Amino acid sequence: MCRLLAYASSEPATLAPIVGPTLSDFVELSKEHKHGWGVTTCASIGGVQERERDLAPAVESTLFAEVASSKPTDGALVHLRLASKGLAVDLSNNHPFIHGDISFMHNGTIRPASSIEHLVDADLLAQLTSSTD
């Protein structure tokens, strides 16, 4: 399963001071959760600000280091991906996902996915952009 981290702050801050010295331990997990990462930042007013993703493990990604230290925000979702067996290692499968002004991520796999498709409106199914959302 993937590793997920989220935070909300009363003042804009970057991931590094919010998580503190244990951030390096979290990033080290990407040696095992090596199929990329994703981060969405948000504002309490206005919703999702931006999303950054990379297929490189966070521990090797200069982009992850930049996002963690230089993107102040009052909330973020962070995802380290360990791809489920049989699912593509593809940037489109790296969470967090965005729908409108909502960002979300999940952990785990439902197989077969077709077993729950009847629970989702057809217009939403048509908007899927990856094989994991």
Predicted features along the sequence, with ranges:
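Extreme N-terminus nucleophile/cap motif
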Residues: 1-59, 76
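Conserved beta-strand-loop-short alpha-helix elements that form
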Residues: 2, 102-112
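Fold-independent oxyanion-binding glycine-rich loops
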Residues: 7-10, 79-82, 107
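Short helix/loop capping segments that flank catalytic or ligand/cofactor-binding pockets
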Residues: 15-16, 49-51, 86-88, 113-115
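Active-site-proximal cofactor/substrate-binding loop regions of enzyme domains
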Residues: 39, 65, 69
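Regulatory sensory and allosteric helical modules in signal-transduction proteins
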Residues: 49, 71-86
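Short acidic (Asp/Glu) patches
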Residues: 54-66, 79-100, 120-124
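Short histidine
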Residues: 111-133
